[in-house]
Amino acid sequence: MNELRNDLLRYLTISATDEEWGIVVTTVGYQFIPPGCAYPLSRHPEKYNFKPQTGRILNEYQLEYITKGSGYFSSQSCKSQKINAGTMILLFPGEWHSYYPDRETGWDEYWVGFRGIHIDKRVEKKFFTKEEPLHRIGLSATIVGLYEDILKFASEEKSGYQQMISSIVLHILGSVYYKEKNNSFTNTYVVDKIN
């Protein structure tokens, strides 16, 4: 995994043609929160900023990937839980949530925000649910690379970049689903029960 040390936050413009693709990316970035630092950084636009004590509600989905450190997450549908490096958090539109790093460890996080009928359909069919927003997929250089690809295409903003980066988001979602389904059978208790 690349050790990027400068935070990068991108908030993207979306055209009517982009919307017709069925999924669009609204924001992408990464930030590194050292131990003892305030969270979140105050460089986000108002609709994305929040205080961990009060949380927030977004109008889009977001995939937050914690690659270093630990912290806490809670939402309207999920009680407070400890999260560690290797956890992917799926935030849902219209769902109150809060998350923050442990002050002793800080954390490194990548995120991508998105919306559209492709993800709405996957949620409707219960591939992803508000009750289970935490996906403990482990650390993956491949997934970090996908986030970095989104960042690269988003910073270049060439024609068709929205279609490219939103398709990468679908790849990440597929990877999360696959990893979680296959990780569940590494639990010896589950394997013993099946046998």
Task: Please provide the spans of the model-predicted regions.
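Generic protein-terminus/edge-of-domain signal
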Residues: M1-S74, K79-Q81
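Amphipathic alpha-helical segments enriched in hydrophobic/aromatic residues interleaved with Lys/Arg
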Residues: T13, K121-T186, V190-N195
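Phosphate/oxyanion-binding loops and surfaces in catalytic or ligand/nucleic-acid-binding neighborhoods
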Residues: V28-Q31, P35, I117, F153, ...
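Short acidic-glycine-tyrosine-enriched beta hairpin
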Residues: S77-F92
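Tight coil/turn sites that cap or link beta-strands
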Residues: G36, K47-F50, A85-G86, G94, ...
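Ligand-binding loop in jelly-roll beta-barrel domains
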Residues: S80, G94-H118
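Short, charged/polar surface micro-motifs in flexible loops or helix N-caps
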Residues: P35, K68-S70, M88, G94-W96, ...
